[in-house]
């Protein structure tokens, strides 16, 4: 039985967007173990994904931290991966290909280019179009890449809703990734006040923070 590695860091939205591709990869390697290399924030969430046989933590420490990179290399080498599917396609994962994972067959944006095609042109396409082309180039049968099914991630929160709402509510996601704080809209507190005024508190306003956003969420 061979081992297959998928690399996906990014944000939660990026991982959700890649979920269909992960399913297609698993379906194409049914007799192999498929593992995901990802960030700490998504270990618990992706550990429940039925298309994965395991999740490996990448602390994503600076590349000058040779002790960490050496430990990560030793860990990855233990799995003896036959294929790597780089769905992140970042400078970091290019570095991993060059120095940490030289032996496996590698699938990335760069390996998916047609003769004469420039990477800059390839990157102008939508994320899912790029992933689909990448997987097709690696002979993956495409069925779910653009038909993402997240039923496995649904949780029963009826008890929470009964505690904080009367059945109807307004849910707000006011946060963004730490790397791109410039994308965060600064007027959510004012918006919440306006919503309460407009609906005269008819609908409770709920916020869905991440683990590091709870204190800030309470201030809203």
Language model: regions and residue ranges:
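Catalytic machinery of carbohydrate-active enzymes
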Residues: 1-220
């Amino acid at each position: 039985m061979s081992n297959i590695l998928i690399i996906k860091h990014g944000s939660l939205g990026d991982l959700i967007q890649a979920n269909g591709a992960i399913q297609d990869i698993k379906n194409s390697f049914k007799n192999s173990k498929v593992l995901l290399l990802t960030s700490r924030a998504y270990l618990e969430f992706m550990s429940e994904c039925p298309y994965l046989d395991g999740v490996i933590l990448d602390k994503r420490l600076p590349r000058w931290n040779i002790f960490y990179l050496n430990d990560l290399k030793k860990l990855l080498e233990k799995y003896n991966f036959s294929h790597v599917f780089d769905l992140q396609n970042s400078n970091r994962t290019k570095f991993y290909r060059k120095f940490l994972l030289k032996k496996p067959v590698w699938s990335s944006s760069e390996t998916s280019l047609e003769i004469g095609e420039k990477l800059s042109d390839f990157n102008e396409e939508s994320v899912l179009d790029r992933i689909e082309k990448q997987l097709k180039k690696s002979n993956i049968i495409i069925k779910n890449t653009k038909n993402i099914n997240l039923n496995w991630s649904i949780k029963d929160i009826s008890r929470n809703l009964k505690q904080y709402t009367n059945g109807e509510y307004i849910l707000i996601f006011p946060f963004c990734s730490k790397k791109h704080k410039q994308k965060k809209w600064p007027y959510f507190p004012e918006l919440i006040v306006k919503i309460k005024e407009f609906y005269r508190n008819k609908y409770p306003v709920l916020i869905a923070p991440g683990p590091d956003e709870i204190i800030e969420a309470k201030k809203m």
